[in-house]
């Protein structure tokens, strides 16, 4: 043990002596191989907790604060995709799908016809189903984009717009007039207000 300690002390002394007597030799260490290892973005399989968003095209990991900040950080610009940025402000797709599904389960397969028009019959199958509608509500920046994504008839789109306008203006009478009961008003209004607040009517 003592011999090992003496050897370590001797090696340290030799290294320090080299620094004193040959300073230029020590300073000649090539640090260029370390350049590039201090990126603000990380590549690889797993992302760090402070850079949890992985770009789908190039496996670059970026901070959540860099999403939708106006400057692309992913090679393909996915972090600035308008659908991604809209979905980030909206209720999660799962929450929207669950809400729509619960309305259908409670009130019948054609209940959402009151909101989305004639194509919303049969548990939204003509529109692609509950998940398709939930995704379109999440990703569509505006009601026009939503109508285009689901190929809504112009009359159905205008009806939906009038429903959203009623919610925005606090006109619960309009919602009652299309058959939404008092017991359902609170939930429907709460859900639609979330979309209105994120620019759905702009």
From Swiss-Prot:
GO terms for cellular component: extracellular region. Disulfide bonds join 47-61, 55-74, 68-85. It is found in: Secreted. Residues 46-86 form the LDL-receptor class A domain. Keywords: Disulfide bond, Secreted, Signal. Residues 1-28 form the signal peptide. Pfam families: Ldl_recept_a. PANTHER family: PROHORMONE-4. This is Prohormone-4. It comes from Apis mellifera (Honeybee).
